[in-house]
Amino acid sequence: MQPTLVILVVGLTPSLIGEDTPNLKRLCADGGLRPLATVTPAVTCTVQSTLATGLPPSGHGAVANGWYFRDLAEVWLWRQSNRLIGGEKIWEAGKRKNPDFTCAKMFWWYNMYSSADWSATPRPMYPADGRKIPDHYAEPLELHDELDAKLGQFPLFTFWGPVADISSSDWIMKSTLHVMETRKPTLALTYLPHLDYNLQRLGPDLDHPRLKQDLREIDACCGELIEAAEREGRAVIVVSEYGITNVTDAVHINRALRQAGLIRVRPEEFGREILDAGASTAFALADHQIAHVYVQDPARIGEVKALIEAMDGVEQVLDEDGKRAFGLDHPRSGELVAISKPDRWFSYYYWLDDAVAPDFARTVDIHRKPGYDPVELFFDPAIANPKLAAGWRLAKRKLGQRALMDVISLKDTQLVKGSHGRPTDDPNEGPLVISSKPNLLDGDGPVEATAFKQLVLDHVFS
């Protein structure tokens, strides 16, 4: 077996490889690069599940970064159990082919209770006093303590949120190096999210000095991994899930459904409104540039479809035939799936008056919000000194007081300059595959995301 390293570099596209990415540029020159024909929605959980299983969303069930759990009548995003994902995974196929095959899965999603030999994933601690304490989950248990002892606490707050930066990717890179050195897995999978942050904050402005710095930083992380892989005699594959393209503002799909009388809310927390998904006739789970629209009354699907199609910023709305064409015909999908125009994205906002927005709307809270919220990448522009404000709230928490980290805007959706999820129009702005083995990446056309699993196995077993 040929030991192999797969580096998932979020948001990396052919257009981003150049003078600021010398290590990746060298890998392309010595090996090969092909576009990746990704799936829809082109979002983290969906694409990673396709890369790992070789199946479309209709086969593995990760129809977005979350979905409406119909039996619970609740929306849940960013679940972590690998048992939610159907299909045979890369590492299971490898072990079936050779029982000596091993796999380390470092920070890919759905990474708890996985059948991979070694794994690690973000997993904060939530004490009853309301704090969120950075931590990670690792299998086996001793790996957790090894990584903490070697690298310190996982930097959760730089993994996502308004202060997200290179330190989380650097920690993941070093944890991967440790596992490669100490466990010698046949296949090592790692995930570097750094480009995701400023590409959404700033858009893919290749002349922006901050983005050029980001490219140099992520290339340095990749360089350390590639150097270690070459030292260990590993093949190297670099892959991305999606490309991030320019956007101007959000489409407030749930507000339109609310105004049409299709969404029900319940007043809680001193009059603040909470989405009552189970009692709503129709609501949308917004996830970047797609939205799953769940319609409880089949007789009203046509009415809801027409309403959404008429909204400014909506490109198309998939019904059953449309979902089948996109590989989204799965029971977890909404009755309808909306896709935005290239320069727009969907917000989850369902309230019509900011005074009654839920308290979590002003915080980084990926689990309570019934949809993805890229505005979490920004401090509220209305706060004069946001870092001081956040520090004061954090100090109160450390003193044992409950304090709401309400430092995120709930209305400045125009802050977001980059998004993803819909099919990318220009392959140069879309995801890619790079391989150190050009003979395994021959041809000029795109690599189908559903073919990536076999491509990895070919690297290991050819």
Describe every region a protein language model picked out:
Residues 2-14, 27, 51, 94, ...:
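Beta-strand elements within well-structured catalytic alpha/beta cores of enzymes
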Residues 5-9, 29-35, 43-49, 66-79, ...:
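Glycine-/proline-rich flexible loop or hinge segments
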Residues 11-14, 41-42, 57, 108-113, ...:
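Short, solvent-exposed loop/turn segments at secondary-structure junctions
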Residues 15-59, 104:
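Short, structured active-site-proximal loop/turn typified by the sulfatase FGly-forming signature C/S-X-P-X-R
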Residues 19, 37, 42-43, 67-83, ...:
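Secreted, luminal/periplasmic, and some membrane-associated catalytic domains
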Residues 55-205, 280-285, 289-296, 300-303, ...:
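His/Asp/Glu-rich, glycine-adjacent segments
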Residues 121-149, 210-220, 255-274:
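Acidic, His- and aromatic-enriched active-site or binding-groove loops in soluble protein domains
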Residues 415-435:
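Short glycine/proline-rich, acidic loop/turn segments that cap or connect secondary-structure elements
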